[in-house]
Amino acid sequence: MFTGIVSGTAPIVKIEEKDFIRTFTVDLDKYDDNLEIGASVALDGVCMTVVSIENNLVKFDAIEETLSRTTLGKLSVDSSVNIERSLKMGDELGGHIISGHVLMSAKIIQIKDLSLIHI
């Protein structure tokens, strides 16, 4: 589970294409404390599972369904992704409890600038 509060951004340093899977290698230098294989990390709001860790480089696999329903399918090397680690017992719930399981993507058709806020 996630709060929806983004911790920061991290760069994609490598993308590998395999049979039916795209593997993203992300430099999680600032966000890899106690990270383990099998852990959940939200990349641009999408719940992803850690499949490999080498120093600060963390790999995530995405299947075609994930790539077609999210913005992950449009990412390239050097793209930055929003990062959020999953909740742990005792963590502050500063946002909203969300699962990170994406149903679809939507296109923003208008942004209204209301001085200090954007809608």
Where are these regions (language model features)?
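Conserved loop->alpha-helix
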Residues: M1-I117
